[in-house]
């Protein structure tokens, strides 16, 4: 049973939430590290791990799934070239979340999420 195993809603409708997670995933893979709220960082962690696992697989079907999710096609090519060399021995846990000081305007818990 999958009781209480839901995705964080992030205070947004489903389409906006999916677009936000896609954008955060794309930017994290592009820059290697982003600053966001702690809840968003925890939500995007599973998506980034899924993209890196697809890149380690390296098959055409995995590449097409990544192209359908990430916003930048050139980024998909770079990810698929580097993932097996960078994360070849690692079985998951490709990201690290570091808590930082709260945001000034609304005191939201902030975090830095980065690729290991």
From Swiss-Prot:
One term under GO cellular component: cytosolic large ribosomal subunit
Keyword set, alphabetical order: Ribonucleoprotein, Ribosomal protein
Keyword Isomerase: no
Family affiliation: Belongs to the bacterial ribosomal protein bL17 family.
Any GO molecular function: structural constituent of ribosome
Keyword Ribonucleoprotein in annotation: yes
GO biological process, one term: translation
Subunit composition and interactions: Part of the 50S ribosomal subunit. Contacts protein L32.
Pfam family for this entry, one: Ribosomal_L17
Protein name: Large ribosomal subunit protein bL17
């Amino acid at each position: 049973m999958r009781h209480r195993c839901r995705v964080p809603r992030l205070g947004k409708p489903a389409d906006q939430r999916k677009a936000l997670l896609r954008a955060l995933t794309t930017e994290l893979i592009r820059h290697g590290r982003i600053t966001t709220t702690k809840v968003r960082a925890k939500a995007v962690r599973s998506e980034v791990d899924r993209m890196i696992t697809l890149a380690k697989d390296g098959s055409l079907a995995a590449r097409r799934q990544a192209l359908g999710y990430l916003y930048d096609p050139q980024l998909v090519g770079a990810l698929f070239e580097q993932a097996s060399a960078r994360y070849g021995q690692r079985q998951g846990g490709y990201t690290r979340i570091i808590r930082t000081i709260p945001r000034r305007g609304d005191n939201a818990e902030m975090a830095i999420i980065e690729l290991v």
